[in-house]
Amino acid sequence: MALDEAMDKLARVDAAKAELVKLRLFGGLTGKQAADVLGISYATEQRHWAYARSWLRVEVAGRQ
């Protein structure tokens, strides 16, 4: 449940990063595939992915 709530919060804060997380975690896409779907460079995808993972880790840890 904590991940679901954190994803909802991320979507409100940064919808693009939330969409990336959905594509990577739940859609099973690679970074390059997700970058293509989102129309961003692979380097940007990597930065956004690192940020989103860290952000979610902090949010989920704070809810426990």
Identify the role of each PLM range.
Residues 1-11:
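Acidic, proline/glycine-rich intrinsically disordered inter-domain spacer in sigma factors
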Residues 2, 26-27, 52:
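Generic, ordered loop/turn and secondary-structure boundary motif
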Residues 11-33:
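Short amphipathic alpha helix immediately N-terminal
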Residues 27-47:
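Helix-turn-helix DNA-binding module
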Residues 53-64:
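Short, Lys/Arg-enriched C-terminal cap helix and immediately downstream tail that follows
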